[in-house]
Design a protein with these regions (language model features):
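Active-site-adjacent structural elements that line small-molecule/cofactor binding pockets in enzymes
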Residues: 1-284
Length: 284
């Protein structure tokens, strides 16, 4: 499956009425972004959400980043994936993840639950084959599972050091597609303010903080909204050229594809920012 080097990570919170999804997706494709990632989260329905994005595009891959294995039953996901694949000529990639204990009642044995979920996808008729699915993965065991049972890994909220480590664990071949949030803002104070608004969603989650600790970030970095050191490592900011340099560091470190999520507040989808970033991100 061809993802291109740079894609867009599109929060499910931007689900809009009418033709808004359709128009935005079509323009992002026309700008040259190779894959449109949208969070599936806790919505059990795949066909309507991702079908709109596929119908709005002609070439771009559309990927779920991610669908929770706790809320979307394999028996429902399998037919939905088959439908999306058929209507798009094979342009849909199923992203799956174990979510977080704070969001899932009865959360237990997440690794084992993901394994069981993949077993169930394999047992469907037709199955969802490994090459059509990708796993949200941070730690070594989930990365190894992503290499063995899926097309690869889709890490989220990570510094570039994680991308390098993930490539070592995955080895050559499996897909590595990290999400990288960015702030298109040259004023450092304002950029860090926006970055912290975004980080506040994720710093309370042990999955993310435990992963950051593997790379030398301690309590002083994680508490209080995140230290400048941590925030700037995970969330690049600056003008388009500065952001492109930081995004391309992930490609140099071993990523095959980077999903760029523009952080610009919560008022509207940041289409203007994606337009401004496209020449620097997508140019040779």
């Amino acid at each position: 499956m061809e993802l291109g080097r740079i894609g867009v990570w599109w929060s499910g919170s931007w689900r809009a009425a009418g033709d808004a999804d359709h128009n935005v997706a079509g323009e992002l494709e026309s700008l040259g972004y190779g894959t449109l990632w949208s969070s599936g989260g806790f919505d059990p329905g795949l066909s309507s959400r991702f079908g709109r994005l596929l119908d709005a595009t002609e070439r771009a891959t559309v990927a779920s980043g991610i669908v929770s294995v706790w809320t979307a039953a394999p028996a429902d996901v399998g037919p939905a994936v088959a439908d999306l694949e058929a209507r798009s000529g094979g342009r849909f990639l199923l992203g799956l993840g174990a979510s977080h204990s704070s969001l899932v009642p009865g959360y237990a044995r997440p690794y084992a639950h993901v394994v069981e979920y993949l077993d169930a996808l394999d047992a469907l008729d037709p199955p969802v084959p490994p090459e059509r699915r990708i796993l949200a993965a941070l730690g070594p065991r989930m990365l190894e599972l992503a290499a063995a049972r899926a097309a690869g890994a889709h890490p989220y909220f990570v510094p570039v050091e994680h991308t390098a480590r993930a490539r070592e664990v995955l080895g050559r071949g499996p897909l590595l597609a990290p999400e990288v949030a960015v702030v298109l803002e040259t004023d450092r104070t304002r950029a860090l303010e926006l970055a912290r608004q975004y980080a506040a969603i994720y710093l309370p989650a042990p999955n993310y903080t435990n992963n950051l600790r593997r790379f030398g970030y301690g309590d002083a970095d994680i508490e209080g909204g995140g230290s400048d050191r941590l925030i700037e490592a995970v969330i690049p900011w600056g003008d388009a050229d500065a952001i492109a340099r930081r995004v391309h560091e992930h490609l140099t470190a071993g990523a095959d594809h980077v999903c760029v999520q523009v952080v610009a507040g919560f008022e509207k989808f940041p289409l203007d920012e994606y337009r401004a970033l496209a020449p620097a991100l997508l140019g040779d």
